[in-house]
């Protein structure tokens, strides 16, 4: 769990959870346009002999690539990473291949939405808690491998992420809206993907 709370909001930290040990853990502050502070947490893992470099982030969206948080990540972290298998995921506040996320097209990462493939034009990962308006797909999982073959076999959006009807949470804001929309776990719907790694004609 990182120590930088997004935009100084209460408890908006980035985290990486893993069934396997994590090591070389760190957090990088992002110096870019948009709300501040923004950051990215990272950790390494080794899962059944497959080394992974994992990044989790929450950044402001931007209409342009220049000086955006996405460009900062692409230029300063993804491009310079020597990791064999790199994964970067989180809330990017931009649609795939739009706005600031165009910067990811230049650094060789692939999107689970393109690999599955899933048309993101008519689905959404975020519902604005006050208005109920949908933002479209602004949460993403990107990945890059150098020599190991990897296939995305399954994945999508979890639309049933709600608290139980009996749940009661203390909150100063959005209590009425939280009740109105069925007590969701978050204003963002979780996304997931299954990756199959292959090396020497064997699956992992």
Model-derived features: positions:
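Structured beta-strand-rich core segments of catalytic domains in phosphoester-bond hydrolases
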Residues: 1-55
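A short, polar/proline- and glycine-enriched secondary-structure boundary/capping micro-motif
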Residues: 37, 64-68, 163-167
């Amino acid at each position: 769990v990182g120590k930088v709370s997004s935009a100084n909001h209460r408890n908006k930290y980035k985290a990486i959870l893993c069934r396997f040990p994590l090591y070389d853990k760190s957090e990088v502050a992002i110096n870019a346009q948009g709300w501040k502070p923004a950051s990215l947490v990272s950790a390494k893992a080794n899962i059944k002999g497959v080394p992974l470099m994992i990044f989790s982030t929450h950044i402001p969206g931007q209409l342009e690539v220049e000086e955006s948080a996405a460009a900062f990540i692409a230029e300063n972290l993804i491009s310079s990473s020597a990791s064999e298998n790199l994964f970067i995921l989180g809330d990017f506040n931009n649609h795939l291949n739009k706005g600031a996320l165009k910067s990811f097209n230049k650094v060789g990462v692939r999107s689970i939405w393109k690999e599955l493939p899933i048309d993101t034009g008519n689905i959404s990962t975020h519902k604005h808690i006050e208005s109920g308006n949908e933002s479209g797909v602004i949460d993403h999982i990107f990945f890059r491998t150098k020599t190991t073959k990897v296939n995305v076999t399954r994945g999508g959006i979890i639309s049933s992420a709600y608290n139980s009807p009996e749940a009661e949470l203390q909150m100063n804001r959005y209590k009425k809206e939280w009740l109105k929309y069925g007590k969701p776990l978050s204003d963002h719907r979780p996304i997931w993907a299954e990756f199959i790694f292959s090396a020497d004609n064997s699956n992992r």
